[in-house]
């Protein structure tokens, strides 16, 4: 059996500033949490080697700035993405309401081959905060995800490391499926022109 080439999966993490994108990424890759992260300027990324269905892949996780003034940097960072993670804070209604805009922004900037089927995953972060402060219910988030084509949804806490590995396992699996479908369809990009010459001088037998 021939050895498979190494696979690099590019995953973009989007959401408003302060929802915990950097914390989620650091908890997943480095198993660390800090309450004093500075706002991401532009974009940053971390990598982690993971096994997806017996296949070794490298996850390249891009943490992009949530501030509007950096959204114009999007094209270069979004292109070639295999999965997009949309993050909001369950205690912040504005961050949840912004998910639609982040999703649309990604699809416009990244221009995936098959937009309706591009894999997204939604994370409702900061569930460690006391329940009384929560403003977005699980039901409301699930309804949003179902309306967008049954996007996988996880409620997470970067601080308490809740559902982090489970969420990123689904992210990795969906990203790999996307990468493989892109690879497959890429084999058929070049049209084949078949031109048949009429042999006018030949006999019509």
Swiss-Prot record:
Name the family the entry cites.
Answer: Belongs to the small GTPase superfamily. Rab family.
Reply yes or no: does the keyword Repeat apply: no
Name the job this protein performs: Ypt/Rab-type GTPases are key regulators of membrane trafficking and intracellular vesicular transport. They act as molecular switches that convert between GTP-bound and GDP-bound states, and regulate virtually all steps of membrane traffic from the formation of the transport vesicle at the donor membrane to its fusion at the target membrane. In the GDP-bound state, Ypt proteins are predominantly cytosolic, solubilized through the interaction with a GDP dissociation inhibitor (GDI).
Q: Which PROSITE patterns match?
A: RAB
Q: Name one GO biological process term.
A: regulation of vacuole fusion, non-autophagic
Where would you find this protein in the cell?
Late endosome membrane; Vacuole membrane
Q: What membrane topology does the annotation report for this chain?
A: Lipid-anchor
PANTHER family in the cross-refs: RAB FAMILY (PTHR47981), RAS-RELATED PROTEIN RAB-7A (PTHR47981:SF20)
Protein name, please? Ypt/Rab-type GTPase Rab7
Family matches, as Pfam families? Ras
Which keywords describe this protein according to UniProt?
Answer: Endosome, GTP-binding, Lipoprotein, Membrane, Methylation, Nucleotide-binding, Prenylation, Vacuole
Q: Per UniProt, where does GTP bind?
A: 17-23, 33-40, 66, 125-128, 157-159
Query: Which domain of life does this protein belong to?
Result: Eukaryota
Q: Predominant location of this chain?
A: membrane
Cellular component (GO) terms are: fungal-type vacuole membrane; late endosome membrane
Q: Does the keyword Lipoprotein apply?
A: yes
Q: Where is the short sequence motif Effector region located? A: 37-45
Question: Where are the Cysteine methyl ester modifications?
Answer: 205
- How is this chain's activity regulated? Alternates between an inactive form bound to GDP and an active form bound to GTP. Activated by guanine nucleotide-exchange factors (GEFs), and inactivated by GTPase-activating proteins (GAPs).
| Single GO term (MF) | GTP binding
Q: Which gene encodes it?
A: RAB7
The lipid modification S-geranylgeranyl cysteine is placed on: 203, 205
